[in-house]
């Protein structure tokens, strides 16, 4: 008897929603507009302006300045391109869905494009950051190897692989998405209910999300942390081997700059990408949803979206504006006729008379204090050094 009364109550509630298509859609899909649509849109607009201007400047200064066309800057150029794709193509779709959760008006092609875009740029960004970290590790710990192997042609080959892998690994998640319509109890489709969502069994989606989060977040984050830890140990060891006052004066600021940059790289990577992957993993591990779990997930989803786009806006600041050379290039692009905006070159002193190791040249190259060129020792003598210009210049 109790079951019959319960079934009757459900039937009465459902019939109430069936009297209005909009009410029935709200019953099935939730509100058509997010409660946070206005404040989130304002935040997104600020991120959009800062991110687009910053990343365009990065691409422009690298393309216009021959001295900035180095292997490391090629990776930063790739990172700026992926950030621009997110901001110019991904963010407008995100803002649209904040104001119109349904229907999805761009059809199956638009759904596939949206999913593939986000997956591809997500993977390409992380792989680019990881590649930069590996390059810097080699430059600091294995400078002779970096001198021989780190070339622009090699960087272009690696970037081709990065984007190819990103596209390939975006296909599984893209293939399980599509347009889904809600249905009335009689089996007919509800008008205006089209959404871009998972159309295959949910366990397939959960497996893909968990696998890609491991491959494209947990592993890179672990690798980057280990590499920066090893670089820190190497820099600390080199600090203890300083033999004279000249070497101390040259490398004390460089060590501080490198340490600060490494810390910022790891910190920003973790802060911006952790909420995004927590959001995906949270959804993939929950089997039975309750009202409280749904509220927590919605909050995480909003926060993860803000940090996801924020990473695209702060990358030009973190990876480029900490470099003195990039700052000078930015000033040159923004105000080429402004003479007082550009720092004057200091006159170079006489050649050093002390012993300076080859590894120290690469430490200088990684700092904001690096000028257009720094002398590298071609051989170790106690007399005047024979010098050659540094080939690879890291911003």
Swiss-Prot record:
Bilayer topology: Multi-pass membrane protein
Entry keyword set: Cell membrane, Disulfide bond, G-protein coupled receptor, Glycoprotein, Membrane, Receptor, Transducer, Transmembrane, Transmembrane helix
Stretches of the chain found on the membrane's Cytoplasmic side: 63-74, 139-157, 234-257, 315-395
The keyword Lyase is assigned to this record: no
Heme recorded as keyword: no
Sections of the chain in a coiled coil: none
GO biological process: arachidonate secretion; grooming behavior; neuropeptide signaling pathway; phospholipase C-activating G protein-coupled receptor signaling pathway; reduction of food intake in response to dietary excess; response to pain
Pfam families associated with the record: 7tm_1 (PF00001), NmU-R2_C_term (PF19285)
Protein name: Neuromedin-U receptor 2
Source species: Mus musculus (Mouse)
